[in-house]
Amino acid sequence: MGSQVWVVATLLVSIVLIVLTIVKLKFHPFLALLLASFFVGAMMGMSPLDMVNAIESGIGGTLGFLAAVIGLGTILGKMMEVSGAAERIGIALQRCRWLSADVIMVLVGLICGITLFVEVGVVLLIPLAFSIAKKTNTSLLKLAIPLCTALMAVHCVVPPHPAALFVTNKLGADVGTVIVYGLMVGLMASLVGGPLFLKLLGNRLPFKPVPAEFSDLKVREEHTLPSLGATLFTVLLPIALMLVKTIAELNMAKDGTLYTLLEFIGNPITAMFIAVFVAYYLLGIRQHMGMGTMLTHTEHGFGSIANILLIIGAGDRKSTRLNSSHANVSR
């Protein structure tokens, strides 16, 4: 009992240490997580050499799978961004007259958020919110809140986004299954946190017009955008491949050639790899974009994931330190 109390106390102190070093001392999260890992290891009686060895082996093991999928997802998101595919989805949903403007923004955020990091999605899609707000004389808040809620919900719970993919990998869950349930949860959370929340606020929500400095900000001309079919095919292809793998695991004999093929193409790395080259063709080459230009966009996209990969690696080391030092309370 005493050892369990010590473990829980150490864990709680390590969390406080992470928060304080990031918020008060302005440490980078990667450094804060490494510091917490060393702290937990020391409190659990691990030798310095064991702690260093665990960091060396653990970061590589964790990122071996995640780095490939996150990197490929970054390329896919970058192609969505530079080709205007995200705007295409928004324009198409705008034409669904039976949908209210806030629900449209939820669906735009939900679909585009599958391949876009949340901050990229906000920057990329906010001109669409500005455009709808001006055309319909709607408060910008009624459009921006549902959009940001949907983007954040997908970013948190749907692979191949880093946090959701990391948890899925650690738990040994099937990626296809997690995507299906994640999209369902993300949709419900977005509808509650967006349109329903706005209805509950009612007239208490202030009217926010489009800022004057952004009044002339426009969505790209429609004829320059990729087709809706090409856009949706690119976005949904990796999800479909992973779902096919999930269905095969549930319904097929595991010693057949077809099953092996479906397992291969449905692996998250393979599925994202295939989707990237489809995006290069449908969203790049067919949009008159040269390979040199796409290479430049790809390289620019990779710069945004360095922090994510380091933080994931360091965060997993803290978890592994707890397990390595018999700090798993469930034991």
What are these regions (language model features)?
Residues V7-V19, K26-M44, A67-L72, T231-I239, ...:
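Hydrophobic mid-bilayer segments of alpha-helices in multi-pass membrane transport proteins
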Residues I15, S37-F38, L110, G186-S190:
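Residue-level recognition of pore/gate-forming positions within transmembrane alpha-helices
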Residues G2-V5, V180-H297:
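Long, contiguous bundles of hydrophobic transmembrane helices that form the permeation core
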Residues V19, V23, G41-G45, I114, ...:
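Membrane-embedded alpha-helical segments of multi-pass transporters/permeases
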Residues P48-K135, H288-S325, R331:
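Membrane-embedded alpha-helical segments and adjacent helix-loop junctions characteristic
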Residues L99-I114, T136-C156, D174-M188:
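Alpha-helical transmembrane segments of multi-pass membrane proteins
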Residues L20-L31, K134-K142:
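Membrane-helix interface "capping/anchor" motifs
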Residues V19-K26, S47-D50, M252:
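Short, hydrophobic transmembrane alpha-helix segments
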